[in-house]
Design a protein with these regions (language model features):
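Cell-envelope/extracellular polymer assembly enzymes that use nucleotide-activated donors
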Residues: 3-5
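Short, well-formed alpha-helical segments that are part of the catalytic scaffolds
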Residues: 7-29
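A conserved acidic beta->alpha catalytic loop
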Residues: 23, 34-44, 80
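Conserved donor nucleotide-binding strand/loop of the catalytic core
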Residues: 42-70
């Protein structure tokens, strides 16, 4: 049977890394690509038997490509630290690679949870990202700093698994805000060839809210759906606002050296 490397990218994920690693202990190799975490992510992963390599962060696309260089086996299963493989997905993967797969890369459905519930709307299911199961020689990632795409190196089309993995993107509201701030900064770098203004920031942000809350039926997910839509408004607004800020060279008023007046 062909062997599988499960890789997980991580940065300061001590609160999540154990659950992620535990969910892929069935793989022949578990590799954690750490980007110089300052918490005990590395120690926790190693204690569970994962092999840890240090890969500096220069955008998610570059990070994933460099991680692939450290993967040992023919088949790759990609997992983020906020994701968990399920028993059903494990069984489907093992059965697939032990047979004669029709494809060299497979998209994996993700069942995402927020505020204690499964998010069925909001564009969060099946919520495919790049293929998460693929032959090592079949795919590379594009070099986008965030929301990276992929390039197939095979003539076969992408397949789809039927069994979902689980995703828990946010532990609390603080993580929602933190991730929005980080991703909007990374996303601003993708707008270098676009003109931005505060008006365009608001317009793009408003459309992001409407798209997720109305057209992607986020309203069906209760307050969680509203938070997701509002978070997309904020992330999109600040992505364009940060790009606009880069073009303005705003400066504070000139400082003065103030001493006590002479009598």
């Amino acid at each position: 049977m062909p062997k599988i490397t499960a890789y997980i990218i991580a940065f300061n994920e001590a609160a999540k890394i154990e659950a992620a690693v535990n969910s892929v202990l069935w793989a022949d190799e578990v590799l954690v690509a750490d980007s110089n975490s300052t918490d005990n992510t590395v120690e926790l992963a190693q204690a569970l038997g994962a092999r840890v390599v240090q890969v500096p962060f220069h955008g998610f696309g570059d990070l994933r490509n460099r991680t692939l260089e450290h993967c040992t086996h023919e088949w790759i299963f990609s997992l983020d630290s906020d994701e968990r493989c399920t028993a059903e997905a494990r069984d489907e993967i093992l059965a697939l690679v032990s047979g004669e797969p029709s494809h060299d890369a497979y998209l994996v459905p993700r069942r995402s949870y927020m505020m204690g519930r499964w998010i069925e709307g909001s564009g969060w299911y099946p919520n495919y990202r790049q293929p998460q199961l693929f032959r090592k020689t079949a795919m590379r990632y594009t070099l986008d700093p965030v929301h990276e795409g992929y390039e197939l190196l095979t003539s076969k089309p992408v397949g789809h698994l039927t069994q979902a993995i689980h995703q828990f993107p946010f532990r609390n509201m603080a993580e929602v805000i933190h991730k929005m701030n980080r991703y909007s900064t990374l996303g601003a770098a993708k707008l270098t060839r676009k003109r931005a203004s505060m008006a365009s920031a608001f317009g793009h942000g408003l459309w992001a809210f409407i798209k997720h809350y109305i057209f992607k039926r986020g309203f069906k997910d209760g307050w969680a759906g509203f938070v997701i839509a509002f978070g997309n408004f904020e992330g999109t607004f600040y992505r364009y606002a940060k790009r606009y800020e880069e073009t303005q060279n705003w400066q504070p008023p000139p400082s003065e050296k103030l001493t006590r007046p002479k009598p």
